[in-house]
Amino acid sequence: LVVIAIIGILSSVVLASLNTARTKGADAAIKSNLAGARAQAELFYDSNSNSYDGGTATSDVCSATGLAGTVKSIHSAVLAAAAASGIASVSIDLTTGGAAGVANCNSTAAGWAAQVPLKTTGAGYYCVDSLGASITSTTNLISNNTDVTCS
């Protein structure tokens, strides 16, 4: 009986550790995808006459259909980061009003920023922007549709 109790205690410790590892892995995936988005955004910028804006809401660096020649927007990378966080979509230019727990991507001709909530409870958000910032914050850094920096 004592052996069974010890096995039960050890298995609960192992299961708790596995859950923590999964959450940290999801946070790493969020950060990795958003880092890839930054590189993709610069390719988009260079191919789009030094602009992150394609002229319409459906052709900018954040949109799902954005193209600059043959260079795709960052939407798929931000969406992958959102999926790692358990979110099914990305709010483009704050169509959801900057609500907490939402993945956001805003852009203008001169800049862009993307933010995704981290999976770890209480860890907040991870935000990247066209200025090179990579910030983890417990507050929502993109709270209106003019926010294109993580500050």
Where are these regions (language model features)?
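Membrane-proximal extracytoplasmic alpha-helices
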Residues: A21-Q40
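Alpha-helix exit/C-cap motif
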Residues: A35-A64, A80-S89, D93
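N-terminal helix-rich module
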Residues: S59-C62, G66-A82, S107-A110, S143-N144, ...
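Short, surface-exposed beta-strand/loop micro-motifs that present aromatic residues
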Residues: S89-N106, Q115
